[in-house]
Structures are given as C-alpha cells and as structure tokens.
From Swiss-Prot:
UniProt protein name: Curli assembly protein CsgC
Matching Pfam families: Tafi-CsgC
Keywords, alphabetical: Chaperone, Periplasm, Signal
Region forming the signal peptide: 1-8
C-alpha cells in the first residue's frame, strides 16, 4: 500500500482548476513534477463558434520546482452554448519529460 502511495506522489501530472460564473470560465492550468525542471511550457487555446475559429498560443521557458503544485497561467474565457473551446497544456524539457493534457477532458 505504501509503495502505491509513493509511486502516485512521485508521478508528474497536469490538472486544471476551473470555476464558472455564468458563461465565464476561469481555467488555471497547474503542474506537479517529481523532479525540478527547466521546461518549455506551451498553452494553446482553440475556439470554434458562430464567429469562426481562433487560436491563441503562449510559450515560455520556466524553472519549475519539484513536488509542489505550480499554477502556470490564469485564463478567463467567455463560452456560450454555441462555442466549443479546448485548452491544451504541454510541459517538456526536450528530453525525457513530455506531459500534455487537454481541458475540458471531454468535449463540451
């Protein structure tokens, strides 16, 4: 049992903290790494709606510490019922570490 807990604690993970007020969603991508990393962080958001499609991309290199949740950004998005929005977060050190996660995890 303790081995399973230790393995879970050591794994790298990306999560999204999300709050909603009406059509406004606030999305905070968060990463926890098992080892410190100088990583390339990319956030891509894609919106399809009645007014067409838009893409926004942010890239930066960050020094990320180990074993603590790090909030990488804060995005506020107005999503109506006609819109489809996805946010993809990628964290990579260009070698052995490559994490990618999409929000929402299933299609809206």
């Amino acid at each position: 049992m303790h081995t399973l807990l230790l393995l879970a604690a050591l794994s790298n993970q990306i999560t999204f903290i999300t709050t909603q007020q009406g059509d406004i969603y606030t999305v905070i991508p968060q990463v926890i790494l098992s080892e410190p990393c100088v990583c390339q962080v990319q956030i891509l958001s894609v919106r399809n709606g009645t007014w067409g499609q838009s893409h926004t991309q942010q890239k930066q290199t960050l020094s990320l510490p180990a074993n603590q949740p790090i909030e990488l950004s804060r995005l506020s998005v107005n999503i109506s019922s006609e819109d489809s929005v996805k946010i993809i977060l990628t964290v990579s050190n260009g070698q052995s570490l490559h994490l990618s996660q999409q929000w929402p995890s299933s299609a809206r």
